Amino acid sequence: ARTQPGNIAPVGDFTLYPNAPRQGHIVA
């Protein structure tokens, strides 16, 4: 899944944010 900055994303969901794998929300 892809992520956007703002909310917590599941661990491992860091397609667009490899430097912040726990930041962002799923926008898949």
UniProtKB/Swiss-Prot annotation:
Catalytic activity as recorded in UniProt: Endohydrolysis of the N-glycosidic bond at one specific adenosine on the 28S rRNA
GO MF: rRNA N-glycosylase activity; toxin activity
Enzyme Commission designation: 3.2.2.22
Keyword Hydrolase set for record: yes
Function: Inhibits protein synthesis in animal cells. Does not possess ribonuclease activity.
Family stated for the protein in its record: Belongs to the ribosome-inactivating protein family.
Name of the protein this chain belongs to: Ribosome-inactivating protein pleuturegin
Organism: Pleurotus tuber-regium
